[in-house]
Amino acid sequence: MSHLEYFTGILAHLQIDKLLVMHKLFTYLCSALLLVTATSCEKKTEKLLLGGSGWNKIVIIDKNTKQVEWEHPLEKGWECNSAVATPDGNILFAYARGAKLIDRNHQEIWNIAAPDTCEMQTARVLPDGNYLLGWVGHPAVIMEVSPKGEILSRTEYETGIEHPHAQFRQLNKNARGNYLMPLFATSDVREISPRGEVVKITRLEGTPFTTLALANGNHWVACGDGHSLMEVNL
């Protein structure tokens, strides 16, 4: 074997060893990256947006630690029975005198006021990205609003309940495109069409506060002052 062949063989082995080392290093870095990613995923926690009648603030808390991470003060008389985080991270809430959309820096994006004799009680995000607002009164009014605050539709409905505060809190829209209106004073949930016509009335025990659609086609109905939760075919 010549000296040239000898040194060429050594260099070839060195290149192979170098590639093996680089491969091991690459594998290690990938493993470390996956570990960091997994660890980061483990640290992700659910947040809860909380508000309620008689409380002077809206807060976001960490579900695990129970620590308040954000809060927005409410003025005296601002009864907040409906608050929700929008897909873009803003906060939409009803406060009796109207409904506001604010950002996390507490800056008002828009405000829709309710008439003096009415109370805005519903502020929800719809599956299509628009918002559902509703105020109690004579008549009660249901509105669909764009994220920019543009009123897209307006439905009026007379509940037959004299005192507006005894009408409803949280409206929802069902898969048929109608509105579910849980009424306190009459202890029933009414399905109202966008034209303001009654489609169906479901009578319940208790004071229905809100509804939530289930995968099986039924709905949860939470009864506020009735302190109960029931599954109902609405």
Predicted features by range, described:
Residues L4-F7, L11-L14:
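Short hydrophobic targeting helices and cationic amphipathic motifs
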Residues F7, H23-S31:
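Sec-dependent signal peptide recognition
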Residues H13, S31-A32:
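Short, linear, compositionally biased motifs with a strong N-terminal bias
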Residues L35-T45:
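Bacterial Sec-dependent signal peptides at the C-terminal "C-region" and cleavage site
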Residues K44-L234:
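Secretory-pathway ectodomains
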